[in-house]
Amino acid sequence: MIEWHEFSEERRGIDPDERGFQYGDGLFETIAIRQGEPRLWDYHFRRLEAGCKRLALKRPAVAALRDRLGTAIAESAHDSDSCIAKIIVTAGVSERGYGRATPTDPTIYVGVFPATPVNQPAYEKGVATILCETRLAVGSPVAGLKTLNRIEQVLARSECLPTGAFEGLTLDADGRLICGTMS
């Protein structure tokens, strides 16, 4: 189970008018935590910052976000030697409709959950993979961003489960290999 920490001055819980909930208007980063420290923190923060810029979201301050992450890890009941953190930055609450007519204050959520280790034989012998039928969009303005709207990835990953495959490989509409469903 994920333990969520919301860092908003005004509310607790998810507001139904939250743009992240309504439209997938936001970003996320999933970060491995080892010995209580986020791995590749600078990389993850730079990618989150670049995504905020591309989506015209107010960027969180690095020190404040790092402090919030540290608080969530410290307060978590999960083993901080090996767990996972997920940071979600949404566009916050605004008027109804796709457009953000007025600037919004982002909402930041930090979740901490147990890491699922890959068993040793998988490292030694490899894992079963499939080529997913679901194709990823070509030329999307959000390509490369970890947006909250991940329906293509959800559909592709759902193809793996009935087959028992550990990983699914996804292609774009032009047949080029893009990524794995988990990697």
Regions flagged by a language model, labelled:
Residues 179-183:
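Glycine-rich phosphate/ribose-binding loops and adjacent secondary-structure elements
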